[in-house]
């Protein structure tokens, strides 16, 4: 996959944040963790992922450009925290107490599990499903899993199994 072109100023801002937070963590934890690799190959509605064994952070270039400073302030420390937790504690719950501690007490960033960015520009085709109380939009991956009989999804509000709304897909 080709690496998308990121404006140099955006990349520099990402790296400045990453280096500042890493230095802060190394001082607080009295460690010398190395700088992780950063790539801009994350796709879809996911803002970023931490690849633990590769010591790499993958960021979504579209969401970075659309939400610049908020993205840098929230997503970069979020993914760095995953790497630091893995290095310090090994395999633990992704957003568990160790991760929350790392975010709040070491990196001094609010521990938010998910971003609130608009994702219309990066969201792929969705399929409408219904329950007894509302409409749900499922990604193509989830829709295909339902079609193959691998899973079924339930509404969090009413608890009913979601049904594909064939009329809206025509």
From Swiss-Prot:
GO terms for molecular function: zinc ion binding. The active site is at residue 79. Binds 1 zinc ion. It comes from the Bacteria. Keywords: Cytoplasm, Metal-binding, Zinc. Residues 22-163 form the SprT-like domain. InterPro entries: SprT-like_domain (IPR006640), SprT_Zn_ribbon (IPR035240), Uncharacterised_SprT (IPR023483). The keyword Metal-binding applies. It is found in: Cytoplasm. One of its GO terms (cellular component) is cytoplasm. The keyword Metal-binding applies. One of its GO terms (biological process) is response to stress. Its main location: cytoplasm. Its cofactor is Zn(2+). Zn(2+) binds at residues 78, 82. It holds the Pfam family SprT-like. PANTHER family: PROTEIN SPRT. Belongs to the SprT family. NCBIfam families: PRK04860.1 (NF003421). This is Protein SprT. The lineage of its organism: Bacteria, Pseudomonadati, Pseudomonadota, Gammaproteobacteria, Enterobacterales.
């Amino acid at each position: 996959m080709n690496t998308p072109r990121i404006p140099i100023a955006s990349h520099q801002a990402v790296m400045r944040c990453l280096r500042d937070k890493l230095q802060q963590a190394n001082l607080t934890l009295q460690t010398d963790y190395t700088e992780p690799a950063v790539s801009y190959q994350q796709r879809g509605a996911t803002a970023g992922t931490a690849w633990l064994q590769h010591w790499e952070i993958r960021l979504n270039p579209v969401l970075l450009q659309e939400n610049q400073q908020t993205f840098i302030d929230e997503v970069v420390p979020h993914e760095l925290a995953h790497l630091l937790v893995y290095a310090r504690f090994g395999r633990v719950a992704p957003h568990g107490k160790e991760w929350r501690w790392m975010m709040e007490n070491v990196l001094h960033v609010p521990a938010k599990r998910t971003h609130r960015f608009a994702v219309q520009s990066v969201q792929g085709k969705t399929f409408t499903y219904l329950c007894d109380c509302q409409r749900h939009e499922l990604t193509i991956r989830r829709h295909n899993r339902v079609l193959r009989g691998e899973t079924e999804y339930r509404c969090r509000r009413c608890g009913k199994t979601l049904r594909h709304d064939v009329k809206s897909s025509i």
